From Swiss-Prot:
One of its GO terms (molecular function) is RNA binding. This is Uncharacterized RNA pseudouridine synthase jhp_0890. CDD domains: PseudoU_synth_RluA_like. Residues 2-62 form the S4 RNA-binding domain.
């Protein structure tokens, strides 16, 4: 028996640090199941599958705004290293894919865009695949409290901030539902927490879903966003074609 990250470092011919980072990023699986603990003791003959990370791509660019497709497993804050001179306008969770916006920092448009977010004048639409069958549109209105330590964790609490999510079923197959999701507020992990709250957690959510899954990622995609006369769409990856 040996620690997982040490075995992975030998298989991939990489450092222990790099092996740990790959496991912590959710990019390593064994027999179709995601490996969650880098120090887990495993047999010497264990074989790992390592998922490759895509690079972000440009959806649209002008003098005001840069709309990108963010692949899963890339931190939003790392995007500025790919696109110099631009600043993040908002963020997506690391495992969430989809459209994300950057602007020229402290420009007139940046100030207007920040105000649009503050005034809830930004329209966002997500796609999510959840456990179980949801047959009707519904609104989830439950306050969310976020606890921030080394990693953020949110939960439903009377002490939390207002949070409203609207879900619409698009397709049902094999006891899973593909949802269109709209949010009226923007709390940390809002969609993930609200869907867990109604007992339909997102498939592949290792933080809020305890059920084992063969999904290689969190099945949440930022599909569309509109603000200040702009509207952008990121086509959903093939894994959303259920």
């Amino acid at each position: 028996m040996e620690k997982a990250y040490k075995l992975l470092s030998v298989q991939e011919n990489i450092s222990h640090k790099k092996a740990k980072a790959l496991i912590d990023s959710g990019l390593v699986s064994i027999g179709g199941q995601k490996l969650m603990v880098a120090r887990k003791e495993l047999p010497q003959n264990t074989r790992f599958s390592v998922q490759k990370v895509e690079k972000p791509s440009v959806i649209f660019e002008d003098e005001n705004i840069l709309a990108l497709f963010k692949p899963p497993f890339i931190e939003s804050y790392d995007l500025v290293s790919f696109f110099k001179g631009w600043a993040l306008l908002h963020r997506l969770d690391k495992e969430t894919s989809g459209v994300i916006l950057l602007v020229k920092e402290n420009s007139e448009f940046h100030l207007k865009a920040k105000k649009a977010f503050k005034d809830r004048a930004v329209k966002k639409e997500y796609l999510a695949i959840v456990q179980g069958i949801i047959e009707e549109e519904r609104e989830i209105n439950a306050p969310i409290l976020t606890i921030k330590t080394t990693k953020a964790f949110s939960k439903i609490s009377k002490k939390g901030q207002e949070a409203v999510t609207i879900i619409t079923p698009l397709k049902i197959i094999n006891k899973k539902t593909l949802l269109k999701v709209g949010i009226k507020t923007g709390r940390t992990h809002q969609i993930r927490v609200h869907l867990k709250h109604i007992n339909h957690p997102i498939i592949g959510d290792t933080l809020y879903n305890n059920e084992p899954s063969s999904a290689k990622r969190l099945m949440l995609h930022a599909h569309k966003i509109a603000l200040l006369g702009y509207e952008f769409e990121a086509i959903a990856p093939k894994e959303f074609e259920i």
